[in-house]
């Protein structure tokens, strides 16, 4: 199944044109961040935009993309089981509050400090464990929730 997925900045949710909304299957909202191991999102007026988008296209899926270039906190959050659980629980609270369809992880990049962020040699393994914990947490909440990730081409 082919899906058209687009990133939309949080501030632009209230300004999307009808034709753009109708052209998409999934919106990845850019970006939630990680603070003290928890997912946080500066979502001023986001509920209004999400409601308007769903009025135009009720089947459209909307997920919060967490991270982006230079977004720190993944390595620390993913390092322990407790940290992964805290991360996943905080992501779920945002999903519930805003009626989202899942979470996208945009960690650039596990195991490297290229973007000026903290890294650790265990990041690649912990990244997989973080995704698994997020999947488990969202599945326990509701079936069919999205867990997606942005990955590099190398």
Question: Language-model features: where?
Answer:
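Glycine-rich tight-turn/loop motif centered on a GG-T
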Residues: 116-125
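Aromatic-lined carbohydrate-recognition surfaces of secreted/lumenal glycan-active proteins
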Residues: 3-9, 124-154
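Glycan-recognition patch characteristic of GH18 chitinases/ENGases
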Residues: 1-95, 112, 122, 133
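Mobile, glycine-rich extracellular loop/lid and propeptide segments
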Residues: 103-110
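Outer-envelope exported proteins of Gram-negative bacteria
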Residues: 65, 104, 148-150
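Structural motif corresponding to the C-terminal cap of alpha-helices
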Residues: 95-99, 138
């Amino acid at each position: 199944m082919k899906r058209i997925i687009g990133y939309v900045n949080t501030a632009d949710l209230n300004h999307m044109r009808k034709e753009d909304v109708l052209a998409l299957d999934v919106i990845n909202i850019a970006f939630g961040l990680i603070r003290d191991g928890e997912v946080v999102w500066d979502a001023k007026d986001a509920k209004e935009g999400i409601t308007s988008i769903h009025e135009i296209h009720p089947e459209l899926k909307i997920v919060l993309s967490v991270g982006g270039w230079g977004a720190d906190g993944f390595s620390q959050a993913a390092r322990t089981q407790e940290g992964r659980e805290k991360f996943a629980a905080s992501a779920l609270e945002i999903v519930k509050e805003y009626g989202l369809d899942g979470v996208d992880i945009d960690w650039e990049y596990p195991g490297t400090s290229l973007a000026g962020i903290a890294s650790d040699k265990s990041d690649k393994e912990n990244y997989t464990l973080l995704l698994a914990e997020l999947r488990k947490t969202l599945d326990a909440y509701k079936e069919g929730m999205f867990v997606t990730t942005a990955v590099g081409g190398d």
